[in-house]
């Protein structure tokens, strides 16, 4: 019967599927020390295979640079709760109550670019100024993209290399200062 042939074909096909092995699960972690997610990787393992720092040399570490994030926005924000993302050789973080995004050179602490959302009445009235303290990273069509949800309920997509709003993402926001692309109004 036709049903028997379909079932037999399915049985012949299933063994050819690639099934994740236990070894693959143990390969989780961050490639080349990158920390592309809040918890290091998509599984939130908080594990890095890097071994330059260990219990024997930890006490020998010295501060390489200092980056101040308390002066981003209309008033100082002394409670910086952001987990930086490390991808494509850059650190990405947010600072200030407006959640300004900065890309930093991890070797020097130099600011490579910064993105600030235009000031809006929605931000002024937001009860979320102390929440939403991070960014997300993804590769889209071969390039890095930084995503940010702000206290004013806008979702921004930024080119990870330049910090410019992502072309073709979102729709124009009818408020002063917003680019024609790169933003989604979440309200």
Protein language model regions, located:
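Boundary at the C-terminal end of the N-terminal hydrophobic targeting segment
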Residues: 20-25
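Aromatic (tryptophan-biased) beta-strands that constitute blades/sheets of beta-rich domains
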Residues: 27-74, 110-124, 164-186
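Repeat-blade elements of multi-bladed beta-propeller folds
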Residues: 32-39, 77-96, 100, 126-154, ...
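Hydrophobic/aromatic beta-strand positions that recur at structurally equivalent sites within the blades
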Residues: 53-56, 104, 158
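Hydrophobic small-molecule pocket/channel-lining residues, especially in calycin-type beta-barrels
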Residues: 73-75, 97, 105
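Structural core of flavin- and non-heme-iron oxidoreductases
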Residues: 102-106, 115-118, 137-138
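Short loop/turn segments that connect beta-strands within beta-propeller blades
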Residues: 105-108, 160-162
């Amino acid at each position: 019967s036709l049903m028997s042939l379909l079932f037999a074909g399915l049985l012949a096909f299933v063994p050819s599927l690639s099934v994740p092995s236990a070894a693959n699960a143990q390969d989780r972690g961050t490639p080349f020390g990158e920390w592309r997610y809040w918890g290091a990787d998509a599984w939130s393992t908080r594990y890095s295979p890097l071994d330059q720092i260990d219990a024997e040399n930890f006490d020998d570490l010295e501060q390489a640079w200092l980056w101040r994030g308390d002066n981003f926005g209309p008033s100082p924000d002394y409670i910086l709760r952001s987990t930086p993302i490390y991808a494509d050789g850059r650190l990405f973080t947010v600072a200030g109550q407006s959640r300004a995004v900065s890309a930093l050179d991890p070797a020097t602490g130099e600011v490579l670019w910064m993105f600030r959302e235009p000031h809006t009445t929605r931000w002024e009235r937001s009860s979320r100024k102390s929440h939403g303290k991070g960014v997300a990273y993804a590769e889209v069509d071969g390039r890095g993209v930084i995503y940010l949800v702000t206290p004013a309920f806008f979702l921004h997509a930024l080119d990870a290399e330049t910090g410019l709003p992502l072309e073709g993402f979102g729709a124009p926001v009818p408020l002063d200062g917003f680019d024609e692309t790169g933003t989604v109004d979440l309200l």
